Amino acid sequence: MSRLKDKFNETIKPALVKEFDIKNPMLIPALEKIVISVGAGDSAKDQKVLQNMADTISLIAGQKAVITDAKKSVAGFKVREGFPVGIKVTLRKEQMYAFLDKLISVALPRVKDFRGLPKNGFDGRGNYNFGLSEQLMFPEVEYDKILRTHGMNITIATTAKNDKEAFKLLELFGVPFAKGK
């Protein structure tokens, strides 16, 4: 079992039960999944760059990434139906905890002038979204093998009913939030 899953079972669950006065153990907020997604943008036209981006995300996540296609044509964006528009990978169970541990303890501390993740990334239903400007902060990524640097969006889905519960859950996991608002 991963370090964060042990921490969740031993310390975080009891803290959440105490803080929110939860009677039913099935109502304790927990992590559901983590989705890492990248918009391909202009890179979608070059199959080699798109595949390189997918390989990079697969390395970071530890699971094969999927290239997503447009569901319908949009002339304003010069996109046709079936045209590749992004890359995503969904992590659950052990891989989810391993990725979150790597993100918190290795990747985010490597960011220059990192002041914490914004607190306004919650959606009102207990899920948290934030973006990273580049993929080079992860130790698996080798600078020489990257054709183009790109950012990524990370969504942490929880079973929490509201933002307050989700914030406390992520804070107890050790997610570094920005000080202040």
Swiss-Prot record:
GO cellular component, one term: ribonucleoprotein complex
Keyword line: Ribonucleoprotein, Ribosomal protein, RNA-binding, rRNA-binding, tRNA-binding
Lineage of origin: Bacteria, Pseudomonadati, Campylobacterota, Epsilonproteobacteria, Campylobacterales
Record-stated family: Belongs to the universal ribosomal protein uL5 family.
Keyword Cell division included in the entry's annotation: no
Protein name (database record): Large ribosomal subunit protein uL5
One function term, GO molecular function aspect: tRNA binding
Assembly behavior: Part of the 50S ribosomal subunit; part of the 5S rRNA/L5/L18/L25 subcomplex. Contacts the 5S rRNA and the P site tRNA. Forms a bridge to the 30S subunit in the 70S ribosome.
One Pfam family recorded for the sequence: Ribosomal_L5
Function: This is one of the proteins that bind and probably mediate the attachment of the 5S RNA into the large ribosomal subunit, where it forms part of the central protuberance. In the 70S ribosome it contacts protein S13 of the 30S subunit (bridge B1b), connecting the 2 subunits; this bridge is implicated in subunit movement. Contacts the P site tRNA; the 5S rRNA and some of its associated proteins might help stabilize positioning of ribosome-bound tRNAs.
Single GO biological process annotation from the record: translation
Native species: Campylobacter concisus (strain 13826)
Keyword Ribonucleoprotein: yes
